[in-house]
Amino acid sequence: MLKPLGDRVVLKVEEREQKVGGFVIAGAGQDATKTAKVIAVGEGIRTLNGELVAPSVKADDTVLVESHAGIEVKDGEEKYLVVNETNILAIVE
């Protein structure tokens, strides 16, 4: 399992399917955002005074993230996206 450092967040992106003429095109489109599930969260980031600022998201949250943000990584057969918390736009409720 991946354990992110600092203000980084590990996400599992929800793949969207688009149908065109009866064919399913996985991941099609040029959306500006992606929906993802938070898998793991770093401890946060420290201020110049050394105070720890906790992340705004937690494991199992569903979030909206910028589509081109982060780095795709593999852990075994699973693909994850590691982003900075600042790339997360909103928590989906």
Swiss-Prot record:
Keywords: Chaperone, Cytoplasm. GO terms for cellular component: cytoplasm. The keyword Transmembrane does not apply. GO terms for biological process: chaperone cofactor-dependent protein refolding. It is found in: Cytoplasm. PROSITE patterns: CHAPERONINS_CPN10. GO terms for molecular function: ATP binding; metal ion binding; protein folding chaperone; protein-folding chaperone binding; unfolded protein binding. It holds the Pfam family Cpn10. SMART domains: Cpn10. InterPro entries: Chaperonin_GroES, Chaperonin_GroES_sf, Chaprnonin_Cpn10_CS, GroES-like_sf. Heptamer of 7 subunits arranged in a ring. Interacts with the chaperonin GroEL. Together with the chaperonin GroEL, plays an essential role in assisting protein folding. The GroEL-GroES system forms a nano-cage that allows encapsulation of the non-native substrate proteins and provides a physical environment optimized to promote and accelerate protein folding. GroES binds to the apical surface of the GroEL ring, thereby capping the opening of the GroEL channel. Belongs to the GroES chaperonin family. This is Co-chaperonin GroES. The lineage of its organism: Bacteria, Bacillati, Bacillota, Bacilli, Lactobacillales. The gene is groES.
